[in-house]
Amino acid sequence: MGDTHSAAGKNHEYATLSQGASDGKILFTWASGNLLILIGDIEVLLVYEFLMHKDEERVIELEFLRATENAALHSSHWMGRGDKEAADFAACDAIRGMFDLMDIRGEIVIGEGIKDEAPGLFIGEKVGTWAEGSPRFDVALDPVDGTTNVSKGMPNSISCIAAAIPEDGEDCALQEIPAFYMNKLSYPEVVRQAWIKDPSLPISVDAPISEVIKVSAKLLGKNVRDITVMVLDRPRNEYIIEQVRSLGSKLRMIADGDITAAMAPSLPSTDVDLYAGIGGAPEAVLSAAGLRCLGGGQQAKIWPADEAEKQQLIKDGWGDQLDRIYRSKDLAAGNNILFCATGISASPLLQGVHIDGKTAVTHSVLMRIKSKTVRFVEAHHDLRTKTIRLRSTKEETRM
């Protein structure tokens, strides 16, 4: 190893930054025993700006990332064991445990559970220490997006959080949608910019997917047969599947996990061009937050599962919103939003948890709307010293 330098400020005396002698690797060692590997000049090194600055969003962002890391690690023990509820509980327990240590005044605005019905983190739940003077955050999260995938040992599962500091005059930056499902369409930045310039283009969740594919192919410089559409494999999406196949385009069907699927068309490392179909409404808000940071577009429209849900939405005052097309900015408003996720099993966005002897490796992404910086973080956790604080035990628990 080369020289070791202190990266700690007056109030941060727990970190050291070491410059490796080979391959341009930079090693950042935490007193907790975790090892974070940053390769070359990848911009993820800027994660450590929080050591030098007072920006509240920047200071706390790594703590949110640690929450998804812990959730991914703890739920990964249930990979392929056929118990998705246990995997979900493990992730929730780890996230709650991390939130208990965070000096924020947080409130869950998009969750997955109902109050008093574990394991989900319910809407309205207060998280953080709520210490005087601590920053307020609205929190949207999915402790495990892809619980079925985890239970079956399949790919495409992540733990993710979107957090926002509401801007002046805003009650909430992350829009709660009271429906179970939304019909969604997501596409890369090139397509989004083209639609902004010419709104008459048939780039709409209301348009036939065949028309969306044709115009997207022109904009992306591809043949229609080379356009890849990702679709959640559900009977309710059969009409989309049939259109894609009839047109001769490529189809990639997934069993679960439509947050990463909605973001896939905007990721440079995937060959997915479009995501279309009916998926979860809470997931639409999380993917909107991610796409606001990453670039790319999403449209979503409330999709009542049956007449009873439709009538309930009308009764609750949402009748005039049933035909509304929500864009990313409608679901994730303002510029004080961060998005982080950690892979549980491999997905288009992230690699999954890998345990090799005494080391667990996690892959995460951390993004902010304000800076538009996308940071990919590979963390090596020494299992001889690694602990996860769990809400259920209120203690640090060995992996």
Give the role of each language-model region:
Residues T29, D88-G169, Q175:
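Flexible, acidic active-site loops/lids enriched in D/E/S/T/G that coordinate Mg2+ and/or position polar
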Residues Y48-H53, I60, A264-M399:
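Oxyanion/phosphate-interacting regions
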Residues P143-K152, N156-C160, E238, I259-M263, ...:
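Short glycine/serine/threonine-rich phosphate/pyrophosphate-binding segments
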Residues D100-L101, V127-S134, D142, S151-M154, ...:
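Solvent-exposed alpha-helices and their adjacent loops that cap or buttress functional pockets
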Residues A162, P166-M253, D320, S347-H354, ...:
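Acidic beta-strand-loop-alpha-helix segment within the catalytic core
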Residues K115-E117, R236, A255-A262:
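Short acidic loop-to-helix transition motifs that present clustered carboxylates
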Residues E63-R66, S75-A87, A91-G97, L101-I104, ...:
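Alpha/propeptide regions of enzymes that mature by internal proteolysis
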Residues T4-S6, N11-A15, G20, G24-I26, ...:
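Alpha-helix boundary/capping motif
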